[in-house]
Amino acid sequence: MLAPKKQKFRKAHKGRVASKAKAGTTLAFGSFGLKSIDGWRVTARQIEAGRKAATRCMKRQGRLWIRIFPDVPVSKKPAEVRMGKGKGSPEFFAVRVSPGRIMFEIEGVEENVALRALELASAKLPVRTRIVRRYE
């Protein structure tokens, strides 16, 4: 799974996904891409599940790019622990995905295969998405 090698701080604020994405809104590598419509937090496990679903559909042909990286540590308190007594320990990493952000890109497969792969990947993600083409 994706995780940063080094962090400046061990824990992060919860934060919000407020505005539209300023960068990463156009296709840079592939011919087809998966663009987010909502703003939400996507975990490393969800990204990995989407990657596996897409590559399985592509039958390891073509190329898949992941344009997002989980860099925000999400902390959680253990089960059945009372409120207070500090913040919990970091459990997993996530990325805050803004509306309009390209998350996956595909190149080197037929159009129907690419569209099916991106549909399968989007089913694994918590955000609403749309599929974009390079020449649209």
Swiss-Prot record:
GO terms for cellular component: cytosolic large ribosomal subunit. SUPFAM superfamilies: Ribosomal protein L16p/L10e. It holds the Pfam family Ribosomal_L16. PROSITE patterns: RIBOSOMAL_L16_1, RIBOSOMAL_L16_2. GO terms for biological process: translation. One of its GO terms (molecular function) is structural constituent of ribosome. InterPro entries: Ribosomal_uL16 (IPR047873), Ribosomal_uL16_bact-type (IPR000114), Ribosomal_uL16_CS (IPR020798), Ribosomal_uL16_dom (IPR016180), Ribosomal_uL16_sf (IPR036920). Keywords: Ribonucleoprotein, Ribosomal protein, RNA-binding, rRNA-binding, tRNA-binding. Part of the 50S ribosomal subunit. Binds 23S rRNA and is also seen to make contacts with the A and possibly P site tRNAs. Belongs to the universal ribosomal protein uL16 family. PANTHER family: 50S/60S RIBOSOMAL PROTEIN L16 (PTHR12220), LARGE RIBOSOMAL SUBUNIT PROTEIN UL16M (PTHR12220:SF13). This is Large ribosomal subunit protein uL16. The lineage of its organism: Bacteria, Pseudomonadati, Pseudomonadota, Alphaproteobacteria, Rickettsiales. The gene is rplP.
